[in-house]
Amino acid sequence: MKVTYFLEVTSSWCFWSEPMWAELKARYAGRVAFDWEIAKMLPGDWPVSRAQCDWFYRRSGTIVRSPFMLNSGWFEPVKPGTYPAASYVAEAAKDFGFTGDEIRLALSHAGEREGQKIGRLEVAVAIAAQAGGKKLPAKKLRAAAESKAVAARIDASTQEFFAHQISQRPAFVLSDDIGDKAVFSGLVHLEPLTAAIDAMLADVAAYTSFKSHHGNPPAR
């Protein structure tokens, strides 16, 4: 079984979902494969001002009962034809073996807690390189973040996100070997996902048990 997490590094709702994501990975370690992919936001999805960003942060922070408010200091208007760098840098870090959460979490924390300008390539690269240490050289990381290969991967994962007929991040797509699929878009609470994962694992186990007793279905 696999769970794919679609995210945007600068998304506040993705920030709030991280404790739940960490709990899922710990609870189902060894039984479920976990992966994350970038789902780019559309131009109209971004806040248009820092004041508007703060309003969104007050809303999401209140909903999740956070004891702190996120920092909008990272905000800069997204210019036409450009995209904030943080997600590209996080994706590029995968090329250096950082396929876990550590680099994108460092970027998210720097932006949404410290207010650093993670939309700027040089800032995002510096933060990621510090988080990755000697295994993540800044010059090579920057080249990868600007590469056509990374852009193509992000475009492909974004297309996959929209192919599920969803628009809200975070999104979680659950799939298993017997063809079941569950899609959650915009939820940050643990319980709906654990209920679905438990049900799907139980079904897979039942199919496995049946096959051990009866084999494959007759050809005719």
Predicted regions and their residues:
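Short, cysteine/histidine-rich loop/knuckle motifs that typically chelate Zn2+
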Residues: 13
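Extreme N-terminal starter segment of soluble prokaryotic enzymes
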Residues: 1-4
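C-terminal cap of thioredoxin/glutaredoxin-like
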Residues: 6, 10, 18-26, 109-220
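Structural alpha/beta surface segment adjacent to cysteine/selenocysteine redox centers
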Residues: 16-114, 211-217
